[in-house]
Design a protein with these regions (language model features):
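Short glycine/serine- and small hydrophobic-enriched flexible loop segments
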Residues: 120-123, 150-154
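Contiguous mid-protein beta-loop-alpha structural module that forms a pocket-lining wall or clamp
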Residues: 129, 143-146, 152-158
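Glycine-rich phosphate-binding loop at the start of an alpha helix
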Residues: 60, 112-116, 142
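A mid-to-C-terminal "edge-of-domain" accessory segment
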Residues: 150, 156-289
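Hydrophobic alpha-helical scaffolding
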Residues: 20, 49-52, 56, 78-85, ...
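Histidine/acidic-residue-rich catalytic or RNA/ligand-binding cores of hydrolases
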Residues: 88, 140-147
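Alpha/beta enzyme core
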Residues: 2-103, 118-126
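Small-aliphatic-rich amphipathic alpha-helix that forms the alpha element of a beta-alpha
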Residues: 110-133
């Protein structure tokens, strides 16, 4: 069971229109009631970080009261999304030093830092992270669990999912986008269709030698694929790699590759585009074979 409680003194006064002590009593009574009924209790301390700036003693008292009443996790909420990672990390560390609570983190993305703030909280000692798939949420969104989980597991080597589950990230992210009728972002970290896409000829030449030269992780680790884009920036390596994706080996067809490169550049200069038109590129390619 998740409860939401005010931890900012100004919100208690102006939004709840009650006394600070009464707010603490309501938190205590609610948690104890649920615990007696056998419920696990998660408390979301709303506006915690803004409250900590305003009145740190009271914000800490909310955490202590909830912990003593038996809350399993107290999630510190950056409800307005205005925190930056360095300050947030310092606050989480301070709270852990001054209470015995098991802390979680709940971030909004109003500064574009929801993912970074969540990771900073974990590094500071939080053991519970709240967020949403693809970062969906009010205003500018919540912390994207897809990126958070991938970062924790791939970068921090923390096994937060069962073995092999992370490889479902791409499929799940896009399934959720379809169900919610929200167009997926091509540039979403890890699972966007452009996350491991390459266009520049220099990149393609290096990727032929070793994909890790221009990729921070193996795209298969999150169920994604490397994509080679064909455009007016394409060189011979780009054309050869894209052709391999389509099942056509041009490694011994240097003249064909040269003609395809020139045709692509000429057509793109007239307004055509091949980046998301694999079938059109394949037709052009087969015309030159």
């Amino acid at each position: 069971m998740t409860l939401v409680a005010k931890s900012h003194d100004r919100h208690v006064d102006l939004a709840l229109k009650t006394h600070l002590d009464e707010n603490l009593a309501m938190i205590k009574d609610s948690i104890e009631f649920l615990r007696k009924g056998g419920q696990r209790v998660f408390l979301d301390a709303e506006h915690f970080f803004d409250g900590y700036r305003s009145n740190p003693a009271y914000a800490l008292e909310v955490v202590r009261t909830a912990a003593e009443a038996g809350a399993d996790v107290i999630a510190l909420c950056d409800t307005n999304g205005g925190m930056l990672p360095d300050e947030l990390s310092s606050v989480v560390h301070d709270v852990l030093q001054k209470s015995s609570a098991r802390l979680g983190i709940h971030c909004h993305n109003d500064t574009g830092c929801a993912i970074a703030n969540s990771l900073a909280a974990v590094a500071a000692g939080a053991t519970h992270v709240q967020g949403t798939l693809n970062g969906y949420g009010e205003r500018t969104g919540n912390a994207d669990l897809v990126s958070i989980i991938a970062n924790l597991q791939l970068k921090k080597k923390q096994q937060v999912l069962p073995q092999g589950a992370l490889e479902e990230a791409f499929r799940i992210s896009h399934a959720v986008a379809e169900v919610t009728n929200v167009a997926p972002s091509a540039r979403q970290p890890y699972v966007g269709v452009s996350a491991f896409a390459h266009k520049a000829g220099l990149h393609a030449s290096a990727i032929k030698v070793d994909p890790a030269l221009y990729q921070h992780e193996d795209p298969e680790s999150v169920g994604n694929d490397m994509r080679m884009l064909v455009s007016d920036m394409a060189g011979r390596a780009s054309i050869e790699l894209k052709s391999q994706e389509l099942g056509i080996d041009l490694s011994q067809e240097k003249e064909v590759v040269s003609r395809v490169v020139e045709r692509v550049k000429a057509m793109e200069s007239r307004g055509y585009t091949f980046e998301a038109a694999d079938a059109s590129f394949e037709l052009l390619l087969r015309e030159e074979l």
